[in-house]
Amino acid sequence: MGNGKTTLVKEGIAKAINRPFAFIALGGASDSAFFDGHSYTYEGSHWGRIIDILIDSKCMNPIIYFDELDKVSETFKGEEIIHLLTHLTDPSQNSLFQDNYFPGVHIDLSKSLFIFSFNDETKVDRILKDRMYVINTKGFKPEDKIAICNDYILPELMDTFMFNKEDIIFEKEAVEYIIETHTEKEEGVRNLKRCLETIISKINIYNLSQTNSNDKQIPLTFEINNFSIPLTINKERVDSLLSKKEDKFKPPEHMYM
């Protein structure tokens, strides 16, 4: 949904309680061996992601954030993952966690903090959900998105593209226009950030093309009229930089060859 769940945990909770943060994308996990490793008797075997996290964090009480719990597949392999996660979150068992690479060695995970995120609660295993304290997060209001844009997203993007704060100025109406017309009415700010990144990236490319020392200009697929730094972004420039031009060589939709 893009309403800042990961950021809240990584930049908020982890820093507030001064614990290392580790991220695991459950949508990309193929089976339980990803977490608890393979037996050392197999060629090329390795310990699992949980042990990796403990090694990297150099402590036994990190925050382990499992993202997109509702994306775990409903296949047999997915059930294996759910069973392992159920074991990890059981206070009576998680002090005796074992990685297949280290048979017989008990790993105490009882001090670790496990946090899960999901968008569709109906797709979360009932037994696993029963072990959780569920906190519902809401989407942002337009004024919240503008504040997040000005205070966090724009400073981060300006720093990424090595612009000064005064180099690119977004009018408030321009940001409101992006939110209303280019973000598909999302509850979070993921598409808003993507749009702002596209705009600033194009400005950066255009600026580099104009300052190119070679006589031959770099050909671009877009134009920025009256370009100069500092540059003010209004609604007209938003439309120009975010417009999707049709590819004349692209075959019509639903046409098969």
Regions found by a protein language model. Name each.
Residues 1-26, 55-56, 86:
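Walker A/P-loop
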Residues 15-46, 53, 73, 144:
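AAA+/P-loop NTPase substrate/partner-engagement loops
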Residues 57-61, 97-117, 166-170, 226-233:
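AAA+/SF3 P-loop NTPase mechanochemical coupling elements
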Residues 58, 120-130, 134-194, 205-224:
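Conserved C-terminal "switch" segment of AAA+ ATPases
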Residues 67-69, 90, 111-121:
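A short beta-strand-to-loop transition that corresponds to the Sensor-1 phosphate-sensing loop
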Residues 68-107:
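Conserved catalytic/switch belt of AAA+ P-loop NTPases
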Residues 77-78, 101-102, 107, 119-132:
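Short regulatory helix/loop adjacent to the ATP-binding pocket of P-loop NTPases
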Residues 190, 195-257:
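C-terminal engagement/docking regions of AAA+ P-loop ATPases
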